[in-house]
Amino acid sequence: MNPLIFTMIMLTVILGTTIVMMSSHWLMIWMGFEMNMLAVIPLLMKQYNPRSMEAATKYFLTQATASMLLMLAVIINLLYSGQWTFTKLMNPTASIIMTLALGMKMGLAPFHFWVPEVTQGISLSSGLILLTWQKLAPLSVLYVISPAINLDLILLMSMMSIAIGGWGGLNQTQLRKILAYSSIAHMGWMASILVFNPTMTLLNLLLYILMTTTTFMLFMVASATTTLSLSHMWNKMPLITTSTLTIMLSLGGLPPLTGFLPKWMIIQELTKNNNITLATLMAITALLNLFFYMRLTYATSLTMFPTTNNMKMKWQFNNKKQLKCLPVLIILSTITLPLAPAITLLN
């Protein structure tokens, strides 16, 4: 892609998200979502092939449907309240439709169907944008309207997302699909605590973006897209491979790694609000997510056949993709909790 065009598209994506996050008018919010969606589609088709075109089409159809539902909710609310103000969401019907529309944009169950398919059909760099930056706009709207959200609906969607995110990743060998299902599960964790403690949702989002960004960057450095290609990294870059597997365990929520921190805090907050049954179900379902990451780590490190390239001086060219910020990201993505245990006191 032409660097000038790429820069313009990225600026439009950032501008669209910024408009959504800073506007107090429903029409401006809808316009920001549309700008963001139309600018992201060329990024998804950066590698011009049938798979990426199919992924971009699925993404467009899903997001267009969600935008239509969003506008429907805005119009219902306008007829009920008579104003376009962002914070005035008083109609229960409008609130339910709005939650469903934003859940579809985020990839919450039962509207999760597009996330694995789209992520699998695009490049790793585009997948990074899709699973991190594209979550900011809908989550920011949910954050502001959280007092008006239907509690039963959002808890049902979050519980389904955590369960589907765990079950869906069990039989996957494609790393992008594994991260897509992990994203669905993490969105479920964020949505579950949104009504009770919106600030904790932001902390969870920050840690999720940190861990997912680091994982994608490691995959891009190693050019790994499957579990088999991940196992072949041992001879060429053992440190990168070890870091990748550790961060994936952190994404699964293995204590005492960073990924355990948001799960621990969310379960603690749900228990404080007398949602003990929900907290127990979420903790049990989270084991599915941890299981497929542990199985992936075990299979990649201990059960793969050894490769024949054991020479000290390898014929491969040096990797040019090394990034200076990677060591810091790896440390933050793995041992934030042991380094700063006082973060658990945040509310």
Curated annotation (Swiss-Prot):
Q: What does this protein do?
A: Core subunit of the mitochondrial membrane respiratory chain NADH dehydrogenase (Complex I) which catalyzes electron transfer from NADH through the respiratory chain, using ubiquinone as an electron acceptor. Essential for the catalytic activity and assembly of complex I.
Q: Does the keyword Electron transport apply?
A: yes
Q: Which reaction does it catalyse?
A: a ubiquinone + NADH + 5 H(+)(in) = a ubiquinol + NAD(+) + 4 H(+)(out)
Identify the enzyme class. translocase
Q: Which UniProt keywords apply?
A: Electron transport, Membrane, Mitochondrion, Mitochondrion inner membrane, NAD, Respiratory chain, Translocase, Transmembrane, Transmembrane helix, Transport, Ubiquinone
Q: How does it assemble?
A: Core subunit of respiratory chain NADH dehydrogenase (Complex I) which is composed of 45 different subunits. Interacts with TMEM242.
Q: What is this protein called?
A: NADH-ubiquinone oxidoreductase chain 2
Q: Which Enzyme Commission number(s) are listed?
A: 7.1.1.2
Q: Which GO terms describe its biological process?
A: mitochondrial electron transport, NADH to ubiquinone; mitochondrial respiratory chain complex I assembly
Q: Identify the main location.
A: mitochondrion
Q: Which family does it belong to?
A: Belongs to the complex I subunit 2 family.
GO cellular component, as recorded = mitochondrial inner membrane
Where would you find the membrane-spanning parts of this chain? 3-23, 25-45, 59-79, 96-116, 122-144, 149-171, 178-198, 202-222, 247-267, 276-296, 326-346
> Its Gene Ontology molecular function terms?
NADH dehydrogenase (ubiquinone) activity
Q: Which domain of life is it from?
A: Eukaryota
Matching Pfam families: NADH_dehy_S2_C, Proton_antipo_M
Where is this protein found?
Mitochondrion inner membrane
Membrane-related topology note? Multi-pass membrane protein
